[in-house]
Amino acid sequence: MGDKTRVQVSKLKPGRYILIDDEPCRIANITVSSPGKHGSAKARIEAVGIFDGKVRSIVKPTSAEVDVPIIDKKTGQIIAITPDTVQLMDMETYDLFDVPIATGVNEEIKDKLKEGINVEYWETLGRIKIMKLKGESS
C-alpha cells in the first residue's frame, strides 16, 4: 500500500498506470518517435489523473525508467454518507475510514451511493478513491 515500482518506458502500454508529477495516472496514449541518426527513440505518454482527472503528458527516452504506482483494489461497504465524506468499512480488515466526496468518488457513481452497498475502492500512495458499485443490499 502506497508503494511504487520502476518500469522501463518501452514496456508501458495504454490502460496501465504511471506516476506523473507524483500523481497516479492512467495511460491514454503512447506515441514513439523513431530514433534519428544520433539519438534514441522517444516516447510521448499522455495520461489522465486518477484522482483529479487532469490530462498530463511527458516525453521520455524509451530506455528510461519511470515510476509506476502499485494500486490495491479492495471491496468496502458504505457505512455513512455525510455532505463532504463517505465512511467506508474494508470488507477484509473491517477498518473504518473516511473518503472525501470531492476527490475520492468516481463522478459516474456519485448519485448512486447509498448506505449499506458494497463498492470497489482503489488505494495507492496513501490516497483512496471509490471506483464502482459492487452490488446493492436490500
UniProtKB/Swiss-Prot annotation:
GO molecular function, one term: ribosome binding
Disulfide bond annotation, renumbered to this chain: none
GO cellular component, one term: cytoplasm
Main subcellular location of this protein, as a coarse class: cytoplasm
Modified residues (Hypusine): K37
Role noted for this protein: Functions by promoting the formation of the first peptide bond.
Subcellular localization, as worded in the UniProt entry: Cytoplasm
Name of protein: Translation initiation factor 5A
Highest taxon of source: Archaea
Annotated family: Belongs to the eIF-5A family.
Gene name of this polypeptide: eIF5A
UniProt xrefs under Pfam families: eIF-5a, IF5A-like_N
GO biological process, one term: positive regulation of translational elongation
Keyword set, alphabetical order: Cytoplasm, Hypusine, Initiation factor, Protein biosynthesis
PANTHER family for this protein: TRANSLATION INITIATION FACTOR 5A FAMILY MEMBER
